[in-house]
């Protein structure tokens, strides 16, 4: 897992090429003015999915992971908590949606949380389970 902010001005050269490409796309596009939908960056290999979503209570958000794709979460506005833990292979799968490369889990253990603000990004690898769109701990 990688957590940082586009606003930090960090060089993306330290990351693999696919992550560099995704982060440069985040940095160079105004997501607030984009319509929800899928935007191809490098065909089906690298793409952005724009959502207009509200955060929910942690109990209403399912932990998830992906087998094929990395998942780069980027917050445009508001606040969000992201849950995360390592995929030990011991968690019971609740639902597998192969065409979306999406695995939902019934529950996970040792889940940590990070607070995300506008401009923050988090890269989740197939070895990471994550729980996006959780209501922030701040009022």
Report each predicted region and the residues it spans:
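Short alpha-helix capping/helix-loop boundary micro-motifs
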Residues: 68, 106-111
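Short, intrinsically disordered, charge-balanced linker/junction segments flanking boundaries
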Residues: 57, 137-139
């Amino acid at each position: 897992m990688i957590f940082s902010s586009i606003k930090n001005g960090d060089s993306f050269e330290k990351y693999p090429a696919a992550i560099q490409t995704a982060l440069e796309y985040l940095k160079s596009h105004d997501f607030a003015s984009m319509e929800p939908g899928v935007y191809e960056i490098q065909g089906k290999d690298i793409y952005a999915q724009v959502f207009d979503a509200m955060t929910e209570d942690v109990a209403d958000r399912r932990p998830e992971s992906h087998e094929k794709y990395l998942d780069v979460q980027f917050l445009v506005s508001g606040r969000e908590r992201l849950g995360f833990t390592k995929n030990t292979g011991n968690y019971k799968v609740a639902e597998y949606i192969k065409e979306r490369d999406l695995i939902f889990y019934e529950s996970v253990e040792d889940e940590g949380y990070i607070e995300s603000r506008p401009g923050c990004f988090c890269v989740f690898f197939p070895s990471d389970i994550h729980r996006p769109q959780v209501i922030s701990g701040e009022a």
